[in-house]
């Protein structure tokens, strides 16, 4: 979800389903136009991540802090309108799923009634036995409070929603660059996102 997958069709064969994550109708239109023009392909489905999602967010930091982002329902309406034309062009349905802040059965029903074809849920299941993350990592979600969640600037250049762990409260020197993100400058970023994710899943939430 960190950025626009404009070249995604280049990396998969025609039998592999491709599905972009978007945060607006504008982003959906840009991606689908690019795929149609350059690859003569379209999305098999689309996932909308609203401003309440965890991780990287496709909104401006000030919009997130001031709570002025478009609602998930409004974005859904815009994306469904964009998708119509491409469904007609390619003669197949493009289901639209929504994510971000969906937590209960009532939340799911509300979005289905608003026109979504389904929902995506991630954070809800981190504390389950089936999730293979460490117990230390899970405990941040199980015991965390609303005040512990902050909007931070990620090394990929986008704002994100994260728990303010001891790790997030200090700058970590980068010892090795994995070159996982072309736009990442190890001299200016506060920490290495790849190493941080590996450490967190393994239970080292301090580093």
Which residue ranges define each predicted feature?
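Short catalytic-loop micro-motif centered on adjacent basic/acidic residues
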Residues: 19-20, 96-98
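Active-site entrance/lid segments in N-terminal catalytic domains of soluble metabolic enzymes
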Residues: 1-89
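Charged, low-complexity surface patches
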Residues: 1, 100-101
């Amino acid at each position: 979800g960190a950025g626009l997958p404009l070249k995604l069709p280049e990396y998969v064969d025609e039998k592999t389903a491709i599905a972009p994550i978007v945060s607006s109708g504008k982003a959906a239109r840009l991606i689908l136009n690019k795929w149609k023009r350059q690859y003569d392909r379209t999305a098999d489905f689309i996932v909308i991540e609203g401003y309440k999602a965890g991780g990287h967010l496709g909104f401006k930091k000030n919009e997130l802090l001031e709570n002025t982002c478009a609602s998930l329902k409004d974005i859904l309406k815009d994306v469904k309108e964009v998708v119509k034309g491409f469904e007609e062009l390619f003669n197949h349905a493009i289901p639209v799923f929504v994510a971000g802040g969906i937590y209960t059965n009532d939340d799911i029903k509300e979005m289905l009634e608003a026109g979504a074809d389904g929902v995506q849920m991630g954070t809800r299941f981190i504390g389950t036995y089936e999730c293979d993350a460490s117990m230390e990592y899970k405990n941040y979600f199980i015991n965390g409070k609303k005040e512990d969640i902050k909007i931070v600037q990620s090394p990929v250049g986008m704002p994100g929603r994260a728990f303010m762990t001891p790790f997030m409260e200090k700058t970590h020197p980068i010892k090795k660059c994995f070159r996982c993100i072309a736009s990442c400058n190890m001299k200016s970023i506060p920490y290495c996102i790849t190493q941080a994710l590996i450490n967190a899943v393994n239970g080292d939430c301090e580093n």
